[in-house]
Regions:
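Nucleotide phosphate-binding/pyrophosphate-handling subdomain across enzymes
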Residues: 1-64, 86
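C-terminal helical cap/extension that packs against the catalytic core
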Residues: 55-109
Length: 110
């Protein structure tokens, strides 16, 4: 059995992210070991109101959340990341890593 399990999902709303992280939390618990890492970002030129909600969910439901860039389109990637971070409660901030470069964010998680 591999010590690492990787799941890829296209959760692009707060409801979808909540569902996938809840399922993954149960999967980690069933394995009896490991931690849940979430690597995600929000696309640019899309609904900005979901960004802080998704940041809050990722920080709350993951052991570690890596916030990264995800197709910023015409927006500044750092602005998107800052809007995601705005939803992270101070007590969860220590669980969050910022890595704007998506490839580096994934490498850091695995």
């Amino acid at each position: 059995e591999s010590p690492l399990a990787v799941f890829v999902d296209y959760a692009h709303t707060d409801d979808a992210l909540r569902r996938v992280l809840t399922l993954m939390r149960a999967t980690v618990a069933a394995r009896g070991k490991g931690r849940l890492w979430c690597v995600f970002g929000c696309g640019g030129d899309r609904d900005r109101t979901k960004r802080p909600k998704m940041g809050a969910l990722a920080a709350e439901l993951s052991d570690v959340a890596i916030i990264t860039s995800d197709n910023p389109r015409r927006e500044n990637p750092r602005t998107i990341i800052d809007e995601i971070l705005a939803g992270v409660r101070p007590e969860w901030r220590s669980r969050v890593i910022i890595e704007e470069d998506r490839a580096l964010a994934i490498a850091r998680a695995v």
